[in-house]
Amino acid sequence: MKLVYCAQFHETCGYSHAAMGYLRAIDSVLSDHPQVNFKILSLSFDVRTLSSVPPEDLDLIEKYHFSSQGELDNFLKEGEYNCIWHMTSVVPDLFEIKNIGHLYNNLSWNLRSVIKGSLENYHLLAWETDELPQEYKEAISRYNTKEVIAPSKWNKDTISKIFKSKFIPHVIEGQHTEKNKQLDLPINIKDKFVVFCLSEWVRRKNFNSLVKAFICEFHDKEDAVLVIKTSIPKRVSQESFISSFKQLRDSVRVPSQRENNIILLIDYLDKENINYLYEACDLFALPSYGEGFSIPTAQAASAGKNILCSPVGGHVDYL
């Protein structure tokens, strides 16, 4: 049996974190299934993020990725194979646009052709609302996808209205089993009430409400601190992003002198530093408008932390 798993392995977005979780799980059991010829194909919308992929993840990507054009071509041409494509449904079409994406090892391959050329293809999809966009429906139908794999019951219920769907949760590594490394922060967070948020900075994550609510409640409390770990959106300069954040922070009017109790972290942090922030926090807060699963929230729940989040979405499965 030949199986190729296509995903954004060498990025730092939510889809890449989920894909690496599945890849580690597959790696842990693959030796028990020698009949499976398993390979991966990795794509990215931002080649700059490759430098932020942890070395141990790169080693695992290298272990299963096609190392040469010849190896890839032979795999696709010699005998039938099945395909898993783990991404938003429109990514194969987006990658048809010249210079919009990067293929790992600079190999030459067409994502739509890889999917269509498979004996059976399975689409692994997380979505944030209770209805799929029309372009997603059209893409899934166009590839004659056998089954859509959903990481949450919320997603499965949504997808099952239109397509055959199977529920397979994302893989979460328990924070209590991971090493952590203390992080030098501009504020000493020891003995403080720490609110922690980890996510990409997009409108859907509703950071504006989080920042405003924290300031309204804790602006004059020196024993409370909000720690936000995020990344600068694409095509936005660091200077512009920080300026916008300060405007957001300063736009909240409060009746008394405010404390300097918000920490914004935008630089790359290794896994041990992230684990430290999870361990140090008292509350994980992500008031998102919609989540298909939310790996950061799941990791906080795994660590036994208090959670503040929206009452609907994929994350409700495990809260």
Task: For the regions a language model picked out, list residue spans one by one.
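Nucleotide-activated donor-binding/catalytic signature segment of Leloir-type glycosyltransferases, i.e.
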Residues: 236-272
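Aromatic "clamp/platform" in nucleotide-sugar-dependent glycosyltransferases that forms part
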Residues: 289
